[in-house]
Amino acid sequence: MSNYNIETKCVQSGWQPKNGEPRVLPIIQSTTFKYESSDEMGALFDLEKSGYFYSRLQNPTNDYVAQKICDLEGGCAAMLLSSGQAANFYATFNICEAGDHMISSSAIYGGTFNLFGVTMKKLGIECTFIDPDASEEEIEAAIRPNTKLIFGETIANPALTILDIEKFANVAHRHGMPLIVDNTLSLIHISEPTRH
């Protein structure tokens, strides 16, 4: 879908029905899925096979919605989580571990500021908050040998400060680390954080 316009992606991406399947994405409400044997289920639990076995972990409806978001964002993969805070925690905690350091714009949602400044600190991950108007040199000065990522919000909540994504991305990429962008308050096709 990468060559399609945003309007087409909104309508067509994600669910791709085959002949005889519903035109509209069905909502799968089952929490569990049937298999012929416990060996088949065991292979799924052991991650030897791919498939659905428990909706809390994976569900066809969620997968299609995630694929649509991925197509709209121009990404390579996506997953659904229960909240923005869950997404921020998941993204940062899968990159950082105890003893690591991260950098974040200081103009971010209060819950995220608390997550990085208090909760992650209790887990041994230190965060340095940087003014979003800082120069590339000032951002680079905050980088340490154990810095694993840089974080920012496209439009900060509630201050509505606009993040210079390109500036933060330049620093992150120069140092071989990801820039994680919370794009909650922006429209996908306007800010396009994955372009950076």
Labelled PLM ranges:
Residues 37-86, 111-119:
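Conserved N-terminal alpha-helix of the aminotransferase class I/II PLP-enzyme fold
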Residues 94-112, 131:
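Conserved PLP-anchoring active-site segment centered on the Schiff-base-forming lysine
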